[in-house]
């Protein structure tokens, strides 16, 4: 390390006390030679990220395709993972070829034959060990999520914790894959229903939660007896490589067959192979509404199942009876967390006219305190958008809102200069708008918050529901009647409806998903496991007669 430092600093001699421990050399060097601090920063960042990649077994160029412990080597095209944090290339991943894809599906199909016969609690035990393995790698994996995707380090670590939590949930679930018993109208008969493993589950995940959404699907599917093929986002492929490397440790110890956990990489074409493949009974896809419609149509054409978790256009209603200070935290985090790139990010605030001015002033002042910068620095609240295409969409949305008559309360814009070299850092914007604006009806994956007023709760709920999407919603109120109306049949039409918390940050114990153009799918907790299984009704006759249902007579 010292030799590398000297080379990096053009042979500068290092004068260090022998008592200084090697791991402190960098820190001591920076302290002794403060003028060189700026020079050393890129070296230090490179060194730390190199260490993280080594821990996660990520090479400079990585194979695209794996069936568990084994990887398929090829010379296919490369996907370059570019960090939005600083614009650096982290590493590269090969793309999966059609021949490799077919080998993966064959391997998964063969593995399913034995995996489904393993008792569910034993599959749960393997998932428990995966949770423990994730605990060991929480720090480096969380840092990779933050660096490759751009979310804050706290959110990156939180995403890995979500993986651990779903493992814990799935372990308990493995002993509770319950059916039902029913009473038969025929004497001497017993009826019940049970659930069987479905088969191969194809998982297409998005960049904004590059590891958590995979785990929501995979851990449940595994305890249900399914095998999985995962295509991570081409914008965050290294997170997929890292997860496959982590779980391979557990699979090796437990002699899990190749094909239970498969990884493929590539762009739209690879996703289309999954969607059109009749060997894959279920496709779980997370992404834009446009993508979901294409996948839903492809899977539906072959009468397969699709679990779609698509866009959101989430609103918080701020009642005149709200605790405004508490509401402020939920609104600001919901709008700017992950730089507005959560499907549950808060896009709209529907504020009662009596508190509109007061709350808006609080909001504008809060936005002045937001720190934007390198997400690996825990002092910063907001990191970058994923890439320059996202930045362009953000800028276009602001201009569209202005063109429709929106009033900008907090100016947006792209940040430039030191620390913002990637060109992906933007300022969270706040705009007064109308719910009917075309741009407000559209989900923009960026930190743009639209404000609007209401007079009555009926009006507020109507505005909340009057968008094509139906994922998450919330009301801030201390009035029980208002909260109950919001949660009633005449209230929010979203899959998630909260009271006195924001729209983002769902816990894994509840089913996650939404209605309308959000896709209708449910993942994670509650009884979401049922989508990964096939339901079977059984009737058993334990008499010496064969009576027919509905009293039909058929004598021979």
Give residue ranges: language-model regions.
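Rossmann-like NAD(P) dinucleotide-binding subdomain of oxidoreductase/dehydrogenase enzymes
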Residues: 179-326, 454
């Amino acid at each position: 390390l010292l030799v590398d430092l000297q080379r990096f600093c053009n042979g500068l001699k290092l004068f260090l006390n022998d008592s200084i421990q090697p791991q402190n050399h960098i820190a001591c060097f920076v302290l002794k030679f403060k003028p060189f601090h700026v020079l050393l920063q890129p070296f230090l960042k490179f060194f730390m990220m190199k260490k993280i990649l080594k821990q996660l077994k990520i090479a400079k160029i990585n194979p695209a395709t794996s069936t568990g412990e084994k990887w398929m080597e090829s010379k296919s095209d490369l996907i370059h993972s570019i960090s939005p944090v600083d614009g650096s290339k982290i590493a590269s991943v090969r793309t999966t070829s059609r021949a490799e894809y077919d080998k993966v599906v064959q391997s998964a199909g063969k593995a399913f034959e034995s995996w489904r016969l393993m008792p569910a609690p034993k599959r749960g035990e393997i998932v428990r060990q995966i949770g423990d393995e994730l605990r060991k790698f929480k720090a480096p994996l969380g840092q990779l999520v933050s660096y490759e995707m751009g979310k804050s380090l706290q959110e990156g670590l939180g995403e890995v914790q979500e993986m651990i939590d779903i493992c814990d949930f799935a372990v308990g679930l493995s002993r509770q894959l319950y059916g039902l018993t029913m009473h038969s109208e025929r004497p001497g008969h017993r009826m019940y229903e049970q659930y069987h493993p479905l088969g191969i589950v194809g998982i297409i995940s998005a960049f904004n939660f590059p590891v958590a959404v995979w785990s929501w699907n995979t851990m449940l599917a595994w305890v249900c007896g399914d095998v999985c093929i995962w295509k991570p986002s081409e914008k965050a492929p290294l997170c997929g490589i890292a997860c496959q490397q982590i779980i391979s440790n557990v699979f090796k110890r437990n002699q899990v067959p190749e094909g239970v956990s498969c990884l493929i990489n590539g762009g739209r074409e690879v996703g289309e192979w999954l969607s059109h493949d009749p060997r894959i009974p279920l496709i779980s896809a997370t992404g834009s509404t446009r993508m979901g419609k294409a996948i839903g149509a492809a899977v539906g054409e072959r009468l397969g199942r699709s679990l779609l978790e698509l866009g959101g256009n989430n609103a918080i209603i701020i009642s005149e009876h709200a605790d405004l200070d508490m509401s402020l935290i939920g609104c600001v985090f919901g709008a700017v967390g992950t730089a507005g790139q959560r499907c549950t990010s808060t896009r709209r605030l529907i504020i009662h006219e009596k508190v509109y001015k007061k709350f808006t002033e609080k909001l504008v002042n809060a936005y002045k305190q937001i720190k934007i910068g390198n997400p690996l620095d825990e002092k910063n609240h907001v990191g970058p958008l994923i890439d320059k295409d996202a930045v362009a969409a953000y800028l276009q949305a602001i201009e569209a809102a202005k063109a429709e008559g929106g009033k900008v309360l907090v100016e947006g814009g792209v940040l430039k200069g030191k620390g913002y070299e990637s060109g992906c850092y933007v300022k969270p914007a706040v705009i007064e708008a109308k719910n009917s604006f075309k741009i407000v009806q559209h989900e923009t994956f960026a930190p743009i918050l639209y404000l609007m007023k209401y007079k009555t709760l009926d009006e507020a709920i109507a505005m909340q529901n009057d968008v094509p999407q139906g994922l998450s919603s919330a009301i801030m109120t201390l009035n029980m009647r208002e909260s109950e109306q919001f949660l009633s049949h005449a209230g929010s039409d979203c899959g998630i409806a909260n009271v006195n918390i924001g729209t983002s940050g769902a816990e894994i114990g509840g089913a996650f998903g939404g209605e309308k153009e959000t896709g209708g799918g449910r993942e994670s907790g509650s009884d979401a496991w049922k989508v990964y299984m096939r339901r079977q009704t059984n009737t058993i006759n334990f008499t010496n007669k064969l009576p027919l249902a509905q009293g039909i007579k058929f004598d021979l």
